[in-house]
Curated annotation (Swiss-Prot):
Belongs to the universal ribosomal protein uL10 family. GO terms for molecular function: large ribosomal subunit rRNA binding; structural constituent of ribosome. Part of the ribosomal stalk of the 50S ribosomal subunit. The N-terminus interacts with L11 and the large rRNA to form the base of the stalk. The C-terminus forms an elongated spine to which L12 dimers bind in a sequential fashion forming a multimeric L10(L12)X complex. It comes from Mycobacterium tuberculosis (strain ATCC 25618 / H37Rv). It comes from the Bacteria. This is Large ribosomal subunit protein uL10. Keywords: Ribonucleoprotein, Ribosomal protein, RNA-binding, rRNA-binding. CDD domains: Ribosomal_L10. Forms part of the ribosomal stalk, playing a central role in the interaction of the ribosome with GTP-bound translation factors. One of its GO terms (biological process) is translation. InterPro entries: Ribosomal_uL10, Ribosomal_uL10-like_sf, Ribosomal_uL10_bac, Ribosomal_uL10_bac_type, Ribosomal_uL10_CS_bac.
Amino acid sequence: MARADKATAVADIAAQFKESTATLITEYRGLTVANLAELRRSLTGSATYAVAKNTLIKRAASEAGIEGLDELFVGPTAIAFVTGEPVDAAKAIKTFAKEHKALVIKGGYMDGHPLTVAEVERIADLESREVLLAKLAGAMKGNLAKAAGLFNAPASQLARLAAALQEKKACPGPDSAE
């Protein structure tokens, strides 16, 4: 690879680092081209999966201001640059790694911090943002309905009490028959 090509590659990778909400770093040793294509398809539109030389990745990360990942750039390295929801990309990679033991998750980078393998797997185990928001909305709706019931309860109890008193006055009791 010529020096100019390397500089262009470093600039492209650095731009991807800067544009990404998260990066997931994997080792792809033993995967076929067909496997890599399948993994790229499984990432849908939320991430791009790129294979590059470790020295170029290290330089690009340095240019992008990303530190703490150098020990991950050993062996055949591929990076998922996540532009969408990190949970979706992490789930796709974790699922693919379960099906294809040759893919090894090495770590990642998100919100200015390096991620361990365990942290990437925890992110993959989270539910998507939309599901969490739906659960929050459902919980809020249920609590609002309970609150409305509590606020209406004293008024309805007072109305039932007034109706019972009126009914009692309207019906002569056994004491008034004497």
